[in-house]
Amino acid sequence: MTEQKQQKKWHEKRKHLVGVVVSDKMDKTVVVKVDRKVPHPIYGKHIIKSKKYHAHDEHNECRVGDIVMIRETRPLSKTKRWVVVKILQRARRPEEEIQKQQEGQEQ
């Protein structure tokens, strides 16, 4: 039976997290803040706890405010153990908003 089961590939077994890019100042590295809701141990109220992860961004595509999915990987440096898998949602940029306003005024 175990032979008949499909084996998951190693990269499918790794953890995936979704978070917001808070810093992109380093080359090929972004800092991603991941929020999670945790119940208070005594009172039971859900509290939002956040943690920051350094993630590898090979092509420097991520910008501050982007919502990204990151995947656990082998250690790439002292603090980097995550890789950006994909950008789920781009953050709006002031330049983009100005261009949209100018296009709207021209019409």
Swiss-Prot record:
One of its GO terms (biological process) is translation. GO terms for molecular function: rRNA binding; structural constituent of ribosome. Keywords: Ribonucleoprotein, Ribosomal protein, RNA-binding, rRNA-binding. The keyword Chloroplast does not apply. InterPro entries: NA-bd_OB-fold, Ribosomal_uS17, Ribosomal_uS17_bact/chlr, Ribosomal_uS17_CS. The keyword rRNA-binding applies. One of its GO terms (cellular component) is cytosolic small ribosomal subunit. Pfam families: Ribosomal_S17. Part of the 30S ribosomal subunit. PANTHER family: 40S RIBOSOMAL PROTEIN S11 FAMILY MEMBER (PTHR10744), SMALL RIBOSOMAL SUBUNIT PROTEIN US17M (PTHR10744:SF1). One of the primary rRNA binding proteins, it binds specifically to the 5'-end of 16S ribosomal RNA. Belongs to the universal ribosomal protein uS17 family. This is Small ribosomal subunit protein uS17. It comes from Aquifex aeolicus (strain VF5).
